């Protein structure tokens, strides 16, 4: 084994500086090093209707195979575009009206920083550092890209609602929310504290982690994260998730009265813009080339933006006022620990860890690497530890928790390239996109209806990921019972998030108790946290040998029915007749 496949110390002779210089020179000065003999037309050939096309398979590039420089850059850009929508969506939502209610400057900064941090911390996962004199690693050594986690959005929006209602965040005389940098700083600091949980769990055996968090626990949890986010996305699709959506039909205009083209919430124009994005994504999947399929979400967003700009929905003032370049810590936020947020964020980190294990397993599979054994367990350990550290570093870099992205596994499978050089090129493009602040300003200026058409599809893919995880569950009576019980309360909390808001009536001056009650209330308002806790508890206490149903499947039911009809029509007679 070589490189990241090796578990023990690397005993191979190290390359000298001269070797590295000669290798780099060959990459830039020879045809094989620059473009090779790869069929680049494969990436750009669309699937035209009514045209019979010759199917051809591209060569597979393994983890450490030699790959032409141009191809590495091209596939790296494809990876960056595939994850772009997922990276920019959380900061846009958390900086918007459902989050900290920031202005354009802070929103642009968070989008830029999210891209930069994603690029830098993805490189940490790919590089895979060995912890000195231990058997532990930091990182997977695979094309494991990280981005801002969707699991944080639901908890963060609920927390900001609580902060504004309790006076932690300011409101004006009319009750309208004002920017709350203090609340965002509390989210960052509490996230850094809670990231220690994932770092600690990374030193446990991967087999023990899988036993504690099997698919029957992780599947419904991930599904409800996506389901809860789809509601906010649909509000944006119809015009915006701010105050104009809280009481539609009263004359309020979205996104605001001074917008370039304000309309009432739910107007046909808004619905049409979002549908254009949605339809473009479907067309790219049906007729697009391989590179278009992996970037279908971004292509749909681009088409929607072009039409919205032509129809006068874009506000260019933020783009014109934005600086040319940006970087981490251009803006900072006061760091404080918000006690009620600790319990919900601990649940978020459990979900992030479970997602990471599943995504790393999928990456090993599509990269044609072993998915069991010591090497695989080492990758899981390094990936979980790396993810915990990246979450800690992300918080210190003013960004919410990160998680391993699954959509890039589709890029690997589609392009048949699992090479880390393409992954490093992806990191390079993400950092470059983040540094150019005008690019982030253009993303922040995207109309809500266009963004909603994209995020509805994106969040639905999160929910479907949960369904895919649940498909690996054996549908025994025990597992059906666990899923039913955990879904019952979790789905109810997702549909009615304020169901537990009036349970506690304490109004004393014990701030510690008040913070604990607010934390419990915040957990109970997040359906995925309730489902995850119930699923984990029931999976531990219910015995594995629970009595099965007499009829276990549709085939058994049909067979029993046929036998009963042949044996006799009277109840209870079929069994005796068959025996006879």
UniProtKB/Swiss-Prot annotation:
It is found in: Membrane. One of its GO terms (molecular function) is xanthine transmembrane transporter activity. Pfam families: Xan_ur_permease. Keywords: Membrane, Transmembrane, Transmembrane helix, Transport. InterPro entries: NCS2, Xan_ur_permease. Its main location: membrane. GO terms for biological process: purine nucleobase transport; xanthine transport. It is a multi-pass membrane protein. The chain crosses the membrane at residues 68-88, 107-127, 136-156, 184-204, 211-231, 263-283, 294-314, 385-405, 426-446, 447-467, 481-501, 522-542. Induction: Inducible by 2-thiouric acid, and highly repressible by ammonium. GO terms for cellular component: fungal-type vacuole; plasma membrane. PANTHER family: PURINE PERMEASE C1399.01C-RELATED. Able to transport with low efficiency all natural purines as well as purine analogs. Belongs to the nucleobase:cation symporter-2 (NCS2) (TC 2.A.40) family. This is Purine permease. It comes from Emericella nidulans (strain FGSC A4 / ATCC 38163 / CBS 112.46 / NRRL 194 / M139) (Aspergillus nidulans). The lineage of its organism: Eukaryota, Fungi, Dikarya, Ascomycota, Pezizomycotina.
């Amino acid at each position: 084994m070589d490189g990241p496949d090796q578990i023990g110390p690397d005993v191979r002779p190290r390359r000298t500086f001269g070797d590295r210089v000669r290798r780099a020179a060959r990459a830039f000065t020879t045809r094989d090093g620059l473009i090779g003999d790869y069929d680049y037309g494969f990436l750009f050939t669309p699937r035209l209707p009514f045209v019979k096309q010759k199917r051809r398979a591209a060569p597979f590039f393994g983890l450490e195979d030699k790959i032409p420089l141009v191809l590495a850059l091209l596939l790296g850009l494809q990876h960056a575009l595939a994850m772009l929508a997922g990276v920019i969506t959380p900061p846009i939502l958390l900086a918007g009206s459902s989050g900290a209610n920031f202005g354009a400057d802070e929103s642009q900064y968070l989008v830029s920083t999210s891209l930069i941090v994603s690029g830098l911390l993805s490189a940490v996962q790919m590089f895979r550092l060995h912890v000195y004199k231990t058997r532990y690693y930091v990182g997977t050594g695979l094309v494991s890209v990280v981005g801002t986690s969707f699991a944080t959005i639901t908890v963060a929006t609920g927390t900001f609602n609580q902060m504004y209602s309790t006076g932690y965040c300011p409101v004006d005389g009319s009750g309208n929310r004002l920017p709350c940098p203090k609340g965002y700083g509390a989210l960052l600091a509490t996230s850094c504290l809670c990231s220690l949980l994932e770092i600690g769990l990374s030193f446990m055996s991967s087999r023990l982690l899988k036993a504690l968090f099997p698919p029957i626990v992780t599947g419904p949890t991930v599904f409800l994260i996506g389901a809860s986010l789809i509601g906010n996305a649909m509000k944006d699709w119809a015009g915006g998730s701010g105050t104009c959506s809280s009481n539609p039909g009263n004359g309020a205009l979205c996104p605001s009265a001074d917008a370039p083209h304000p309309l009432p919430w739910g107007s046909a124009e808004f619905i049409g813009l979002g549908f254009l994005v949605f339809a473009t994504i479907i067309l790219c999947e049906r007729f697009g080339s391989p590179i278009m399929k992996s970037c279908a979400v971004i292509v749909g967003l681009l088409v929607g933006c072009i039409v919205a700009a032509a129809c006068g929905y874009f506000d260019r003032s933020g783009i014109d006022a934005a600086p040319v370049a940006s970087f981490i810590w251009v803006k900072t936020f006061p760091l404080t620990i918000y006690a009620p947020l600790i319990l919900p964020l601990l649940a978020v980190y459990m979900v992030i860890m479970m997602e990471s294990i599943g995504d790393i397993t999928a990456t090993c599979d599509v990269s044609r690497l072993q998915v069991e054994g010591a090497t695989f367990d080492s990758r899981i350990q390094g990936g979980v530890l790396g993810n915990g550290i990246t979450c800690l570093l992300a918080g210190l870099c003013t960004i919410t928790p990160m998680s391993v992205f699954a959509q890039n596994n589709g890029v690997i499978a589609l392009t048949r390239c699992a090479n880390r050089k393409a992954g490093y090129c992806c990191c390079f493009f993400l950092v470059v996109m983040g540094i150019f602040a005008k690019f982030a300003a253009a993303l922040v200026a995207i109309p809500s209806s266009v963004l909603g058409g994209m995020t509805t599809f994106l969040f639905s893919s999160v929910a479907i990921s949960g369904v895919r995880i649940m498909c690996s569950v054996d549908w025994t009576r025990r597992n059906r019972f666990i899923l039913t019980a955990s879904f019952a309360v979790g789905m109810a909390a997702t549909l009615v998030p304020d169901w537990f808001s009036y349970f506690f009536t304490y109004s004393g001056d014990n701030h510690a108790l008040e913070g604990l009650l607010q934390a419990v209330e915040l957990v109970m308002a997040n359906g995925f946290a309730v489902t995850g806790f119930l699923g984990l508890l029931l999976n531990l206490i219910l015995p594995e040998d629970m009595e099965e149903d007499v009829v276990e499947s549709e085939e058994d039911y049909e067979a029993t029915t046929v036998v009963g009809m042949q044996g006799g029509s009277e109840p209870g007679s079929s069994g005796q007749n068959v025996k006879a």
